[in-house]
A protein has these predicted regions:
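Glycine-enriched alpha-helix->loop->beta-strand junction motifs that scaffold or abut catalytic
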Residues: 32-36, 82-87, 107-108
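Surface-exposed amphipathic alpha-helices with a cationic face
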Residues: 3-7, 30, 55-59, 103, ...
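Hydrophobic faces of well-ordered beta-strands that scaffold small-molecule active sites
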Residues: 12-17, 37-39, 65-68, 88-90
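Conserved anion-binding
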Residues: 75, 87-120
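Short, acidic/polar
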Residues: 17-32, 71-79
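Alpha-helix-loop-beta-strand connector modules within alpha/beta enzyme cores
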Residues: 48-82, 106-111
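N-terminal amphipathic alpha-helix/helix-capping segment at the start of soluble metabolic enzymes
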Residues: 1-16
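Glycine-rich, proline-tolerant flexible connector loops at the mouths of alpha/beta enzymes
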Residues: 24-26, 30-53
């Protein structure tokens, strides 16, 4: 949904959540007209359980959830995508090689090296 709107040149409204780990904050964002949220997993106090709860709620109410992670971490990327996150942001990607690694971790073969989960 978000990708298509951006591709079509539409303006999308979103925000970053850095402090509030209560999943129902997403309902407030959705009711306020937001189309996506970015959960700050780099500086915020969130753990995988909170990410999973927020992603599940976002999916159920039609709010895209992206997660900012601290760095290039195959395990974290795989878990977030398996949870159903709509995407992720990674700070300090400085080289083509680093960007290519992120793509490989995010996509299934033959375009990438993402493993297959038994639940997704």
């Amino acid at each position: 949904m978000l990708r298509q709107k951006i591709t079509d040149g539409e303006i999308v409204l979103g925000t970053m959540i850095s402090e509030i780990g209560y999943p129902n904050i997403l309902r407030i964002m959705k009711n306020g007209g937001f189309e996506f949220v970015i959960i700050d997993g780099e500086h915020g106090p969130f753990d995988l359980t909170q990410f999973a709860a927020m992603v599940a709620l976002g999916n159920s109410i039609g709010l895209d959830v992206l997660i900012r992670i601290p760095g290039i971490d195959r395990g974290m990327i795989t878990k977030l995508l398996d949870m159903g996150a709509d995407g992720f942001l990674v700070p300090m990607v400085n080289t083509v090689e680093e960007a290519e690694k992120l793509v490989q971790y995010s996509k299934y073969a033959p375009m990438g090296k993402r493993g297959i989960s038994t639940t997704r």
